[in-house]
Design a protein with these regions (language model features):
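Nucleotide-activated sugar donor-binding and catalytic core shared by glycosyltransferases
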Residues: 1-19, 24, 29-170
């Protein structure tokens, strides 16, 4: 049912905007799509591609008219990288992104996605880009991560992995 709703929505987007639509497609999903293609014919503008590498995917996001995703990290990505986005989930775990207006949570219904697309695209065309979420705008993250890892490595090795680090005398 969800895949069918997504197909209907993507076809409507392709018809309305006349732009290529790139869908990062996992192999299992690709198999399901191939079984459905006869029933719901995808618009020729829709391209089902294998999952991209990290940097290629980020590049796709940054140069997209809008990113439509069910990813759990789309809120952070959209906020930090400042690209328009719509989350097609019914719920999420990042309320701070919603509070800042980083993206729109639409669900899978065609009308809601089309309505959300209009709003998000207009905002970015008018250069009304949401501010980065404060929680995501932290300085020196890599330095902090290194310190945390160094601080807890021995503890985790000892308590979780049961490695013995005691010094043995001769």
């Amino acid at each position: 049912k969800n895949l069918k709703s997504l197909f209907i929505s993507l076809n409507s987007i392709a018809e309305k905007y006349k732009l290529p639509i790139v869908v990062s497609t996992h192999p299992r999903t690709k198999n399901r799509i191939e079984k459905m293609e006869e029933k719901i014919k995808p618009n020729k503008l829709i391209k089902f591609l294998k999952p991209q590498g990290f940097f290629d995917y980020i590049n796709l996001q940054q140069f997209s008219k809008c990113v439509i995703s069910d990813s759990g990290t789309i809120t952070e990505e959209s906020s930090i990288l400042k690209f328009p986005a719509i989350m097609i989930r019914q719920a999420h775990e990042r309320p701070e992104g919603m509070d800042k207006g980083t993206l729109i949570m639409s669900g899978l219904e065609k009308e809601r996605i089309l309505e959300s697309l209009e709003v998000v695209i207009k905002q970015y065309e008018d250069e009304i880009v949401p501010q980065i979420v404060d929680d995501y705008n932290v300085d020196n993250v890599s330095s902090k991560v290194v310190k945390i890892i160094l601080s807890y490595t021995e503890y985790v090795n000892r308590t979780v992995w049961k490695k013995d680090f005691s010094i043995k005398s001769n």
